[in-house]
Amino acid sequence: MFANPHPGTLHGEQVGVATLTASRLQARILALETLPPLQVRRIDDEKIRRMHGKSGDEMVKVAHGKAFDAEATRVMNERLEREWPDLRSELLEIMLPLEKLLAAYAASGTPSTAGGLGIDPCFYPQAVLNARDVRDRWTILDLAGDLGLLEEFAEHEE
């Protein structure tokens, strides 16, 4: 989630914070007995280019490459409506609880927030929002974004 260097932080620490963010987001989505419908993503190419600088053109390709069109969104919504209860149950069984992760971080003295790494609190929510364009895999960030849940979630991340 951190595209630019952040003095005083190590990549592994950044990955650790991002892991907790993903765990919180996953827990929030798995708490939903029914999902809101996925929406077709409207991709703002120019915004992606601005946010990702010299990697912007590649990130635009990534975003478009994994975005669902209207038909794929309709099909996925039908599938999620049909399969969500079983999928949710299965994921809840195997998900490592956030509390266990937080306890391990605390026991090892590992920072658990971007603020704990000394990163500007205004930066991290934007990093969470823009991270979905970095990988060509459809991730929990894409699910949350397409469900309309990512922006509200990200604004509370620190």
Predicted regions and their residues:
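Acidic catalytic cores of enzymes that act on phosphate-bearing nucleotides/polynucleotides
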Residues: 1-28
